[in-house]
A protein has these predicted regions:
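Active-site neighborhood of HAD-like aspartate-dependent phosphohydrolases
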Residues: 19-71, 212
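Short, surface-exposed acidic
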Residues: 52-65, 72, 102-116, 235-242
Length: 256
């Protein structure tokens, strides 16, 4: 199977829809945030790399090690784990990352505000927002399940109209792909895992959700996801924009 995880620091991609179906009656949809309801994380990070003059090789070397470790079968504790579980503050993570990065002009990377700058180009994908509203309007329960890179930037005022439950990794001390966080999200909807669809742009998270009984849907773009989800739920989910490169500015710029 090709690499399908949309994670900053990994630059080789095979985008496709991957669906793992459990056969149960589906009553809830749980969605990731960054890279699903927002434009792709890789695109966002590349914009920051260029704007801040970051040496791409230094960033890729650091993030490859941390991300592979974070999602590998023998994952051990590293700064990504700590940040996503809320065990490390955003400011602490910025110091750790900045110390390992290089700039193309040889200057020191500024740690303060690094995460804000890194995700500043993140844009909402209106078609995905419309899809979630349509799912909820059809009587299904909806939840947000996000690995946070800082917990204070989500557009929470929008959440009551979108979600019946919200699970942020840094607020619950768990992170994807740990199975406990998927079970926690299902419980927040009052459902069994087998009654839920998980939408995520990282295939490791889709596989982990499927392992605990959920139907997993790997997100590649809005049109494909809406079509696949509509087929799963048996409801029309029209109007998804086939381009994830368009959207509106998102204040939620430090989460995945």
């Amino acid at each position: 199977m090709g690499r399908t995880c949309d994670v900053p620091g990994l630059d080789e991609w095979t985008f496709k829809i991957v669906i793992v179906i459990n056969g149960a009656q589906l009553r809830g949809v749980i969605t990731d945030w960054g890279g699903v309801l927002t434009t792709p994380i890789l695109t966002t990070v590349q914009a920051w790399i260029q704007a801040d003059g970051i040496d791409w090789d230094s960033y890729r070397t650091v993030m490859r090690a941390w991300v592979v470790d974070a999602y590998g079968p023998d994952a051990s504790q590293n700064p990504v784990h700590a940040l996503e579980r809320g065990e490390c503050s955003g400011a602490e993570f910025e110091q750790i990352l900045a110390a390992r990065l290089l700039r193309t002009d040889g200057r020191v990377v500024t740690a303060d505000g690094l995460l804000q700058r890194m995700f500043a180009a993140s844009m909402r994908v209106p078609a995905m927002y419309d899809m979630i509203r349509a799912v909820r309007g059809a009587g299904f329960r909806t939840a947000l399940l996000s690995n946070s890179w800082g917990c204070d930037e989500y557009p929470r005022a929008d959440f009551p109209g979108l979600f019946d439950a919200v699970v942020i990794s840094g607020e619950c001390g768990m992170r994807k792909p740990e199975q406990a966080i998927f079970l926690h999200a299902a419980k927040g909807l009052g459902l069994e895992p087998e009654q839920c669809v998980l939408i995520d742009d990282i295939e490791a998270n889709v596989a982990a959700a499927a392992a605990c009984g959920m139907t997993g849907l790997h997100h590649a773009d809005a049109a494909q996801t809406a079509a696949a989800l509509g087929d799963l739920l048996g409801v029309p989910l029209d109007g998804a924009d086939p381009s994830t490169g368009t959207g509106t500015p998102s204040p939620g710029n430090t989460m995945r």
